[in-house]
Amino acid sequence: MSDRLTIEQRHNNMAAIRGKDTKPEILVRKFLWARGFRYRLNHPRLPGKPDIVLRKYRTCILVNGCFWHGHEGCKYYVVPKSNTQFWQDKIRRNRERDHEVLHRLAEMGWHTIVIWECELKPAVREKTLESLAFTLNHIFLEDHHIRRYELPEAKPAMVAEPEPRHRD
């Protein structure tokens, strides 16, 4: 089946697809802000410029589109019928780059959370976002747990001086 759009129309359509401020990303950002989580966007010093960076939690959140990042088993990831080899190569390169970015962030000591576009569809959105908040709180508590200090067993010290013995 051939493309219904002209080459020029398809070019304009594809050029309009943005990589930042996507609807799924904005949903996650609004949820985080409403819950009191403060973050930075597309941090330039981190590998891959993660979508959302929470420094306090040492966590990066990547909001991935199912098509562009090749979400296996997802109904939104379907390779187009035209120019198939190009799309397979492009999505494979995206997945390899994603894997490399996750590996480099882990080496730097950063936690990473990947949220897929399909996990933000209305039927499962609330569950996904609540799970995100739970995960962030868990990460914070694990990284900042209270350390107990064990003291060696010793003879208890005396609080008061011994009474002097008087002679009668």
PLM segments and residue spans:
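Nucleic-acid endo/exonuclease domains
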Residues: 1-114, 118-168
